[in-house]
Structures are given as C-alpha cells and as structure tokens.
C-alpha cells in the first residue's frame, strides 16, 4: 500500500516555494522517489523558487541550494519537469555541489540516479538535450 501522506519538509533543510504548481510537482516528485524502492536516507538542502543564478530552469548551487524557476519549468510536460527536478535532487543528494568538476561525469551520475528513482530521464534528455559543459555551469560553480 502506497502512503500518500508524505511530509516533504522532513527531507529538506529549508523550503521557499510559493506557487501551487511547484508545490504539487515537488510533492509528486518526492512521493515517486520515496516509493521507488531507493533505500538510502534522503536528505536535501534548501529549495528556492525563483530565478536561478545562471538564468536556467534549475540548478544546484555551492551553498547546498536547489533553485528552480517555475515560470520556465511550467513550459515542460509534467514528466519532463519531474525528471528535471529529480536530476537536480540527485545532484544535491550525491553532494555534487561539494566536489564540482569541470566535466560531465556528475551529470551522467545524476541522470542515472534520477532514472533509478523511476523518472523518464531519456525523454527529458530527448527534449532538453544531452548534458554539456556550458557557461551556466561554470558561472554557478566558480
């Protein structure tokens, strides 16, 4: 029996989400992760709804914060948006913000964890493109 009463606040240090759209999407994303069979303890930093530092849809910053621009995210189908959120949650869970490297290895590792959690990362990548090194990543982590 799946538990639908998941208190997502227990998984985050701090949450600043204003829009109902992002609240619902985060709830669905966390619920899917919790029920994926993933056996490690889930622990994430802060979630901030608003503009990202580098101007993209979502990012994890050095200070253990996931920033999401819900206005941009809202342009994607729900399964793509959830895969994108899961990808950023994977970066945070794996603590990639502590050991950022100027290559794409962590992008592939985050994709694989999001895939393990049951998200359609392949559709996300088909729609948004393969991971690539770009100025946004360099700006966030410099």
What are the language-model segments listed below?
Residues 45-77, 89-92:
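Active-site scaffold of zinc-dependent metalloenzymes
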Residues 83, 113-114, 118, 126-127:
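Residue-level detection of beta-strand scaffold positions
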Residues 80-88:
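Short alpha-helical catalytic segment bearing the HExxH-like zincin motif
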Residues 5-61:
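Auxiliary, metal-adjacent structural segments of Zn-dependent hydrolase domains
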Residues 74-75, 88-109, 116-122:
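Catalytic Zn2+-binding segment of zinc metalloproteases
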Residues 24-35, 62, 68, 105, ...:
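C-terminal end-helix/capping segment
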Residues 120-142:
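Long, well-structured alpha-helical subdomains associated
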């Amino acid at each position: 029996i799946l538990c639908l009463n998941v208190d997502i606040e227990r998984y985050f240090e701090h949450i600043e989400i204003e829009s109902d759209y992002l609240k619902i999407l985060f709830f669905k994303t966390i619920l899917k992760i919790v029920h994926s069979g993933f056996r490690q303890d889930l622990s994430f930093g802060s979630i901030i709804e608003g503009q990202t530092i580098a101007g993209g849809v979502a990012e994890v910053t050095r200070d253990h914060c996931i920033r999401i621009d819900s206005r941009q995210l809202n342009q994607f189908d729900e399964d793509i948006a959830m895969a994108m959120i899961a990808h950023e949650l994977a970066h945070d869970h794996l603590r990639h913000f502590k050991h950022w490297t100027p290559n794409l290895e962590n992008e592939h590792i985050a994709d694989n964890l999001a895939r393990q959690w049951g998200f359609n990362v392949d559709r996300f990548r088909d729609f948004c493109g393969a991971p690539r090194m770009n100025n946004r990543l360099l700006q966030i982590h410099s």
